Amino acid sequence: MLKKLFNRKPSDTPDIDSNAIPKHVAIIMDGNGRWAKRRGMPRSMGHRAGADVLKQIVIAADEIGIRALTVYGFSTENWKRPEQEVSLLMALIKEYLNYNVKYMHEHNVRIRFIGYIGALSEELQKIIRDAELLTQNNTGLTLQLALNYGGRDEIVRTIRNITNSVVDGSITTDDITEDYVSSQLFTKEFSDVDLLIRPSSDFRISNFLLWQLAYAEFWFTDLHWPDFTKETLLEAVAAYQKRERRFGGLRDEE
């Protein structure tokens, strides 16, 4: 039943309403390794292909009017993968940023990073700081790359920070509202996610943006991330526009 409801494959390019574009889209870029395995390639080739697709999707998202695109680049759980693959992923992230930050800057894309960056190498931290500094005044789409990110970890860190603020008298417990908590998260500059996209057939959120996904619409596809295209993105947006977002309320006819 889930497959019948949620699996979508790109067909002809769908029409979308330019006045109803989701402001904040999140993507779990899944399936790189499986994509490579099906082609008899090493997993590293899948990750490289996925990095190339991200560049194209960022520009496509900006063109259709999405304001923020948050992508899952490396999770807190990914450290459990084989050391060789972790090293490859870190090298690929550095390579991606070194080769693409200037391109993104030229296309007016702002780059931000969410997650516990302090656990990454000094070299990668510098690349991250430089990318954010270079693009900080850009006014197009904001690309948020989640690196060493976990939704539970984010919430725990936020609780600690709020607790410290109460202890030092900066705030009282009465100040702790949903809006205040949102303002303390890594994603504090942006509204909650409107649309979550996950390729590669899995129906789970994998500890991604747990707070921010509270009322998001979910869209799944059998396609692996390296096969994702602008047309796939448009199909996801078109499906989103057909949904009735109720935020806990009733349907119009109920």
Show the residue positions of the predicted features.
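Flexible, compositionally biased loop and terminal segments
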Residues: M1-E254
